[in-house]
């Protein structure tokens, strides 16, 4: 339902963005007070954001890993972001925790937790570790498993309401194309709680 107050807020109350063609949850505030407070919470890393992603190639190595690589504009292609040296003036620190959920010969289903919110962060970090997202042509991911958009879904959001103090937790079920991709690769997903998601 359209909120008439949204026109009075910057960016219509949108607190953070999702990449084009990424499915799932997004936070939209209804008042300026809440919007400003939520923007601060995200900057202070007080908002838990969990994403599901399908990466190309079978996962190898530890089931959990942290990718802490700075991200900046790709010098060769201004439409892309890239991992850059930490002393690069155009780079911003970025950290993603990645956990393997399911694996097969063609690729892997992973859960990603954002510690920072850089443009294309999960897509860049997954490509950097050798698992570009399925159908993410910008970062080298070929179409597979029936997916025609990058296989990235913002599944869970959790934060404390800035006014009431209530702990809020939202979950968005997988869209049909993502479910079909899992079926095509003979993978399954039955959900994971935010508390059980990562060991650290």
Regions found by a protein language model. Name each.
Residues 1-200:
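RNA pseudouridine synthases
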């Amino acid at each position: 339902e359209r909120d008439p107050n949204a026109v009075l807020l910057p960016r219509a109350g949108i607190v953070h963005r999702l990449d084009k063609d990424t499915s799932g949850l997004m936070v939209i505030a209804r008042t300026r007070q809440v919007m400003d407070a939520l923007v601060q919470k995200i900057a202070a890393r007080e908002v838990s954001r969990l994403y599901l992603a399908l990466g190309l190639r079978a996962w190898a190595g530890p089931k959990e890993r942290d990718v802490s690589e700075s991200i900046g504009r790709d010098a060769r292609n201004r439409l892309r972001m890239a991992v850059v040296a930490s002393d690069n003036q155009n780079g911003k620190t970025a950290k993603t925790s990645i956990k393997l959920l399911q694996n097969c010969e063609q690729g892997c289903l992973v859960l990603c937790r954002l510690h920072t919110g850089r443009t294309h962060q999960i897509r860049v970090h997954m490509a950097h570790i050798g698992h570009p997202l399925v159908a993410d042509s910008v970062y080298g991911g070929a179409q597979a498993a029936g997916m025609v958009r990058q296989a990235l879904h913002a599944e869970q959001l959790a934060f404390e309401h800035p006014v009431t103090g209530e702990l809020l937790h939202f979950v968005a079920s997988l869209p049909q194309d993502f479910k079909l991709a899992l079926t095509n690769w003979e993978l399954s997903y039955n959900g994971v709680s935010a508390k059980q998601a990562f060991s650290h």
